[in-house]
Amino acid sequence: MIAILAAGILSPFFVEVTPEVRSSYVSLGKLMEDRPMQITNVRGGYDAGDFGRFGVRNWDVSSLTDRRHDAHRHAFYHTEFGLTWQYDVKLSEDWTLRSDITRSWTMYRGFNRDYASSNRTYSWWQIEQELVNPYVVPFYRLRKCFHGNDYLYFKAGVRKKFTFLDDFYLTPSVYVDGGSSRNYRRVIGTRPDGEKWHSGVSSVTFRLELGWRVCENVSAFVFAEQYEVVGQAARHAIESSSYRCAHKDWTHGGIGLRLRF
């Protein structure tokens, strides 16, 4: 009886945890690190039924090499924390519009104390939507950053999930990253000719994910991605850049788990 009562009380609440190890780290369309990184994404909240799902999120990134710390050890890189609201609109039996809105803060702490940019916080608003259907799922993300990182970023693409052997799936996807002129400079760097970047698409990524549904609450996955900077001027700027992770083409991958309770 107590177990049934506890299950009834806890059922509206949820926790999602996704730990990953990646061979490199691409953040908002920019190759930030070409060495292994560990990422943990945690979400928790309350399912309010017709009013959506309210919660909090935390995204931690840590280096698995000593490159990102002045003390030459594995380094905590940055964390993101914010409030979230998710809402689904049922358009028909097989079509659902899913929305995810967040107000978050990104905090850089604990490495390279000689650089002010290594110890800072900025905030942002973000909306993500996807149209879930039996065919091809289109999706996009729009993020506006403030307080020292004033730029607009977007991501848009499509994906298709294929299920086989009951508990396995294969999901190919393709998407572009881009944004305002400030975002373009953040991703590519300064132009060799001294001109200002225009807003637009800065990169395209091809992704292939293979997953295994271990049980109702746990799935495991591996993925591979091909990252490509687009545009002749942008690729030339990458070639001329002294940034240690300046690669106009990059292949990487990772492994991870998805847990939901």
Q: What is each stretch, according to the model?
A:
Residues 19-23, 40-46, 83-87, 101, ...:
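Residues on the lipid-exposed face of transmembrane beta-strands in outer-membrane beta-barrel proteins
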Residues 206-261:
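Predominantly the C-terminal beta-signal and adjacent terminal strand-loop region
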Residues 22-26, 61-65, 104-108, 143-147, ...:
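Structural signature of outer-membrane beta-barrel domains
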Residues 118-204, 209:
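Detector for outer-membrane/organellar transmembrane beta-barrel domains
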Residues 18, 58-157, 236-251:
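Outer-membrane pore/translocation modules
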Residues 9-70, 85, 252, 258-260:
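Short glycine/proline- and aromatic-enriched beta-strand/turn motifs that initiate or cap beta-hairpins
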Residues 15, 49-56, 92-99, 133-140, ...:
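Repeated loop/turn-to-beta-strand initiation elements of outer-membrane beta-barrel proteins
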Residues 1-16, 245:
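Cleavable N-terminal export/targeting peptides
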